């Protein structure tokens, strides 16, 4: 294993950690690491791995936003509620590093639903659905990252 491969492996590991602990953009970091490896390896297999990683990343991003969003809509959570959650998630990201993005989203959904529905009892089920949507989104992104990492490992052995 050469130095570039080891560094790329570490970057991929950091990217996977960044998906769970959102300090770094995990999936873009993993994708960029595979691009670095493919450009350094200069092999057909390397570029096939990069192409596959690109397709997987795009598919993962699509599913990461499409599936939880559909789930929220199915559960009766409106787009304005989702946008309120997104706005407070952005604020939370800067106010409370790492966990603020999650807390902000949940708080935004809760406050929006509370103002629409009037009571805590009516707003809380929507808030729980928002938590499930967050977990689904993170799960999809993590699975995508693991799939790209596995593809890269296969590529490393194929080019060795």
Where do the model's predicted regions map?
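Mid-bilayer segments of alpha-helical transmembrane spans in multi-pass integral membrane proteins
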Residues: 62, 93-114, 118, 138
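Short amphipathic alpha-helical coupling elements at transmembrane boundaries
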Residues: 70-77, 121-129
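Interfacial segments of multi-pass membrane proteins
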Residues: 29-45, 88-93, 107-116
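Juxtamembrane boundary at the C-terminal end of a transmembrane helix
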Residues: 148-160
